[in-house]
Amino acid sequence: MHIPDGYLGPITCAFFYLIMIPIWYKSIKELKKLDPRKLPLLGVLTAFSFLVMMFNLPVPDGTTAHMVGGTLIAILMDNPWVATIAISIVLIIQAIFFGDGGITCIGANCFNMGVVLPFVGYYVYKFLRDKVGEVIASGIGAYVGIVAAAIVAGFEFGLQPFIEPGYCPYPFTVSVPAMAFAHLITAGPAAAVVTAIVVWYVKKVRPDLFTSKEQQVSGVNA
């Protein structure tokens, strides 16, 4: 899902950089509010995200896809804004030092994988957790989040022939199904299984991370 240089035109790239500036600002403010006891876990999860993004899963159509870990971070930190800054740091490092994703497309990549993915995944999880439990809800959230991010990336590709010809040549009818397919059948299921397993394990060893803010406040008041 890392968009390389040359696929998005300069107008699109500039647009996403402008969008991400206030989002990064808000994310940094949210990070400063994070419980200091969660910071070591955040560091581990950010490193985990870096690792899983480096492993590409083969897709039957000849392409590859990869997990991200944004929904997992959002769930365990109970804050998708924190996931945004964590994933953005990973993507910036990968673009600059590993050539994975273009420098010009950092804004777009951070929007797709650092905003769309964790926010969609986190709120799907929140909607479902009281109905099916944290473990299953986390897996579904991770699946929906990564597929949503892939579809948004597909729309960005498909928009180029209309607004900036000379960059990605594929229309929506090609780009969106291609991106969705790769993540529906490989990265999506992988993200769902891995996220659910990690949430299950962390729930056993750190159940306090799954105590809602309301429950914490009522416990203090009691």
UniProtKB/Swiss-Prot annotation:
Membrane topology: Multi-pass membrane protein
UniProt key word Endoplasmic reticulum: no
GO cellular component: plasma membrane
Compartments where found: Cell membrane
Pfam families (UniProt xref): CbiM
GO biological process: one example: transition metal ion transport
Keywords: Cell membrane, Membrane, Transmembrane, Transmembrane helix, Transport
TM spans (from-to): 3-23, 39-59, 81-101, 102-122, 135-155, 180-200
Statement: the UniProt record of this protein carries the keyword Cell membrane: yes
UniProt superkingdom: Archaea
Signal peptide positions (record): none
InterPro entries for the chain: CbiM/NikMN
NCBIfam families for the chain: PRK11909.1
PANTHER family for this protein: METAL TRANSPORT PROTEIN HI_1621-RELATED
Family: Belongs to the CbiM family.
Job of this protein: May be involved in metal transport.
Name assigned to this protein: Putative metal transport protein MJ1569
Organism field: Methanocaldococcus jannaschii (strain ATCC 43067 / DSM 2661 / JAL-1 / JCM 10045 / NBRC 100440)
UniProt lineage: Archaea, Methanobacteriati, Methanobacteriota, Methanomada group, Methanococci
